[in-house]
Regions:
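Charge-dense, helix-prone N-terminal extensions
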Residues: 1-122
Length: 122
């Protein structure tokens, strides 16, 4: 079941409802990534709704956006039993720890890109 089928656009889910929807088996991986983004990168998550119907609606529904210096660092799309991570230019389907490690590396690269662009504007 996809997240838009459970959470309507008009009814924003709570953090607890999103975690419950994803399921215990994937929650540790999500929490690991969320903690990294909040603590190391000092970004606050923001819930948003996407109406994108691409790829059989997997991008549709509530997502969690993380921005750094006004630029998208990544967006997490929670699904039942897994989650998708969209980083500008690439995406990952996270179902295991190996994929989370790939996502962490991609986030570090994205943060470096944002920092480099910020420095060239100064």
């Amino acid at each position: 079941m996809l997240n838009y089928e459970v959470f309507s656009k008009e009814n924003q889910p709570t953090e607890a409802e999103i975690k419950d929807f994803m399921g215990a088996e994937i929650l540790e991986l999500f929490s690991d990534l969320d903690d990294l983004l909040r603590e190391k990168h000092k970004v606050k998550p923001k819930l948003a709704y996407s109406s994108c119907a691409m790829d059989s609606n997997i991008w549709r529904g509530w997502n969690i956006k993380y921005k750094k210096s006004g630029k998208s660092l990544c967006t997490i799309y929670p699904q039942q039993g897994y989650f998708l991570v969209l980083i500008p230019g690439k995406y990952f389907e996270v179902r295991n720890e190996d994929t989370v490690d790939e996502v962490k590396l991609a986030i570090e690269i994205r943060k470096s890109e944002i920092s480099a662009k910020k420095k060239t504007k100064q």
